[in-house]
Amino acid sequence: MAIQSKYSNTQVESIIAELLAVLEKHQAPTDLSLMALGNCVTHLLQNKVPAESRKVVTEQFAKALSQSVKTN
């Protein structure tokens, strides 16, 4: 989603592959997969992002997500 990242493509792709493997292992349909991933995002925002930063971080994440799925 990010244009520039402090993480390598290898790091990001490895985590994505593991997350997708878990979803495949459970044969999770798309709606369940999105629900589970969304709950993970919520958990991270609530537990890893300071309360005073959550609104901005959430808005930035939502904007990046929206931009990553746009079809021109």
UniProtKB/Swiss-Prot annotation:
InterPro entries: UPF0352, YejL_sf
One Pfam family here: DUF1414
Domain of life: Bacteria
Similarity section: Belongs to the UPF0352 family.
Protein name (record): UPF0352 protein Shal_2512
Source organism of the structure: Shewanella halifaxensis (strain HAW-EB4)
